[in-house]
From Swiss-Prot:
Function: Interacts with the cell-bound hemolysin. Necessary for the extracellular secretion and activation of hemolysin. Member of a two partner secretion pathway (TPS) in which it mediates the secretion of hemolysin.
Gene Ontology molecular functions: porin activity; protein transmembrane transporter activity
Domain POTRA residue range list: 79-152
UniProt keyword terms in alphabetical order: Cell outer membrane, Cytolysis, Hemolysis, Ion transport, Membrane, Porin, Protein transport, Signal, Transmembrane, Transmembrane beta strand, Transport
PROSITE patterns named in the record: POTRA
Protein name (record): Hemolysin transporter protein ShlB
Gene: shlB
Signal peptide start and end residues: 1-18
Species whose genome carries this gene: Serratia marcescens
Biological processes annotated in GO: killing of cells of another organism; monoatomic ion transport; protein secretion by the type V secretion system
Record note on domains: Probably a beta-barrel protein.
Gene Ontology cellular-component terms listed: cell outer membrane; pore complex; type V protein secretion system complex
Cell compartment(s), UniProt: Cell outer membrane
Superkingdom: Bacteria
Amino acid sequence: MIKKITALTLLVSTALSAETLPDSHMMQDMSMGESRRALQDSTREVNQLIEQRRYQQLKQQRLLAEPAAPALPQSAQCLPIAGVYLQGVTLLSPADLSALSGLPEQCISSNDINRLTRELTRLYVQKGYITARVQIVRPNSQGELGLSVTEGFIEKIEGGDRWVNSRLLFPGLEGKPLKLTELDQGLDQANRLQSNTTKLDILPGRQVGGSVIRLRNQHAKPWLITAGTDNYGQKSTGRWLARATATLDSPFGLSDFVSLNANSTLENPAHRYNRAYTLLYSLPYGAFTFSGFASFSSYENHQQLPHNVVKLHGQTQQYGLRSDYVFYRDHDQIDSLSGQLTYKRIDNYFESVRLEVSSPTLTLAELSASHLQILPNGVFSANLSVEQGMPWLGAGRHPSSVHLDSQFTKGKLFANLSQRLRLGDATYQLNNLFYGQYSRDPLPGVEWLSLTDRSAVRGFSRSTQSGDNGWYLQNTLSRSFNLGATTLTPRLGADVGRILPRQDNSGWRSSAGISTGATLRYQRALVDLEVSRGWILSNHATPEDPVQVLARFSYTF
């Protein structure tokens, strides 16, 4: 009896394999596409949450130093001094001091002394030491007039609470020189929480040169919940999705932040679905921001074959730790470095058979440098990063192929220019976004660039183009109209991109798309509509995509 059952099982399996063999590559591509989309969507959500509200202080009015009063009454009359000496200068280098104007050798006037004190004060302000003060000291035995600098320090920081944790936002600053950029950094960290509107006052302290930093915060409710629906899904798993996002500010009283995103398809969930969840936690510490994130997604769809229906399903897991460090900032730019370690596990199945080629396990180490620049009419930001696959946590060379190695190296470049344009009497917003990636190594499919994804070249609902190397450029022109409590923002978009797949010798492939749409905001409600069309430019045999209509509705509680 056992032999008969075994023979029957082998017969059915052989028949199924024979029928589905011609579609094996299609199944691999479909499963890989679902996994890639899920991982890249969760990565995009994490990056947007981390970047959101990070640089508020650059956009607000900065703390300014009061103009220094003249050290001496203005006069061109010669003073009875032989020269000038400085004392109390510890925060300026000899190279900084060499930029000061020289004094006349024969006749030093009050005007010369006042010019020197202004230049010296300006040097301190340019370095961010806005409380430095210069005082006159009586001449020494050599007849040299003294300029004594009180450089200024933070005597005390007060006004913190569970929403604005001064120990983590301004760590170790008490007793140290008062530097404007360090205060701006702490304000940025405080204001990255949507419930905070934090400002500070610099007040005189009790000690000579001391200042008291008093924090003032207007606090709103610490939580937000956003619910919505859209038709951004895929045909195979369902177009319409329900989405929900919940955020909570300072859950542990550490000026920390936690966010949970969830989405699920709505159509026929018993037979096809796509569900995804992303959790993010971040903690500030001065110029550092530490983050941890996790995401999980699963999908299932059924493919109709000539004589039966087969099930394609799978899941992805992603866990990561990240650290961001702002190493330089001034009144109109911020430069930062970040390091990230990410673990990815992908499991795709055709019926009960695991698709090994499209089910890699990856451990990635990433280093990146970011630059943000405030321009007269806009903002420019750029990020350059390098990812390296590591042989950790079960990641290694794929057992079924010598060409699929998890220890690859990939470079990425992201740049965004957002600027205001005056056309006649109207003000428009032009946004140009560029993304490119390159690797000399063959990449696992989940690391490819999806050119026809909604976040790349807009306008595709059926065709797919993806590959190891490539780039795309998104261009969007918009204008906002304020109608009382309602804001209407229509837009036009034009995108182009190219990819170079390594799995064949077809060379570069190109795509382009155009779009038009509008966003309507009324209080906490949002409605967005978009009509787009995409074209595959490098393969005329590819069926043309139809006009795509996308809709999104959301409400924030």
